[in-house]
Each structure stands twice: as structure tokens, then as C-alpha cells.
Swiss-Prot record:
InterPro entries given in the database record: LS, LS/RS, LS/RS_sf
Gene Ontology terms describing biological process: riboflavin biosynthetic process
Name of protein: 6,7-dimethyl-8-ribityllumazine synthase
Binding site for 5-amino-6-(D-ribitylamino)uracil: F23, S57, F58, E59, A81, V82, I83, F114
Subunit (UniProt): Forms an icosahedral capsid composed of 60 subunits, arranged as a dodecamer of pentamers.
GO MF, one example: 6,7-dimethyl-8-ribityllumazine synthase activity
Keywords tagged on the record: Riboflavin biosynthesis, Transferase
Cellular component aspect of the GO annotation: cytosol; riboflavin synthase complex
Gene: ribH
Family (UniProt): Belongs to the DMRL synthase family.
Residue positions of the active site: H89
Pfam entry (one): DMRL_synthase
Length: 156
């Protein structure tokens, strides 16, 4: 049996777009830092990383779609933080963001890493942006690197 999987090697000419929400930036800023740092540590030069900011997580799917369709990137990394409040708003934003980003990945065939936190509390968001539970932005960047590598291998 042949096993084909991606790796985290420097993808050479690969370009990455980080599309990040400004809302909850006290969390998302750390996700962005984690993602950029992970890419750099794996050999991606700064001039191959673009940061695109949107108002909030609800706007991520459209920006991710436009970025993916532009044809300039090997992968897109979507970052945001949706924190549950006392209204159903959380469910709507989290659900539509997730569905929109997933639909874009399937429609374009471009790897899109989902690093949008959907949490119950501010504490959970902070934990997942670089403290107790690691940095989910860095994890999303590693997922993007691995998927770029895998897509290249599958095309050979």
C-alpha cells in the first residue's frame, strides 16, 4: 500500500494569505502572530505571506473566497474568534462562517485552513490563542503547509 501525505517542508514558491477578523482582536491578533510565526519557522519568507483583514468572522467567507479565486495563493488561512454571548448571534455567525469557508475550499480546490475559534468564554479563547491550549493560528498554518504539500504530491 502506498501512503501519500503532506509534510511541513518549505514549499518553495508557495504563497500564503492569512485572512483575519479584526473583531475580538485581543485574541485574533495572537492567532495571526502564531500563524505567521509557524510559516516563517518552516521556511516561508515574509514576502510570501499576506495579511488581509476583515471586520469580523461573518465577513471571512467572502474575503476568503475572493482571495482563493485571485489565483495568487497556494493556501488561505482563515482566522477569527466567535465567543458565545447571551443571544443566538453566536450560532448564526459560527455556522455561516464555517459553511462559507468550507464551501469556498470545495468550490476552488484550494487548501483553506480553518482557524476560527468558536468558544463559550473569553477564557477559552485566550487559552487557544497561545496559552494553555496552544495557538490555533499556528496549528491552522501547519495544516495549510501540509495541505499545500499534499496537493502537490497528488498532482504528480
Amino acid at each position: 500500500m502506498n501512503i501519500i501525505e503532506g509534510d511541513f517542508q518549505n514549499p518553495g514558491s508557495a504563497r500564503f494569505a492569512i485572512v483575519a477578523a479584526r473583531f475580538n482582536d485581543f485574541v485574533v491578533g495572537h492567532l495571526v502572530e502564531g500563524a505567521a510565526d509557524a510559516l516563517r519557522r518552516h521556511g516561508v519568507p515574509d514576502d510570501h505571506i499576506d495579511l488581509i483583514r476583515v471586520p469580523g468572522s461573518f465577513e471571512l467567507p467572502l474575503a476568503v473566497q475572493q482571495t482563493a479565486e485571485a489565483g495568487r495563493y497556494s493556501a488561505v488561512i482563515a482566522l477569527g474568534a466567535v465567543i458565545r454571548g447571551g443571544t443566538p448571534h453566536f450560532e448564526y455567525v459560527a455556522s455561516e462562517c464555517t459553511k462559507g469557508v468550507a464551501a469556498t475550499m470545495m468550490d476552488t480546490g484550494l487548501p483553506i485552513a480553518f482557524g476560527v475559534l468558536t468558544v463559550d468564554t473569553i477564557e477559552q479563547a485566550i487559552e487557544r490563542s497561545g496559552t494553555k491550549a496552544g495557538n490555533k493560528g499556528a496549528e491552522a498554518a501547519l495544516s495549510a503547509l501540509e495541505m499545500v504539500s499534499l496537493m502537490k504530491k497528488l498532482a504528480e
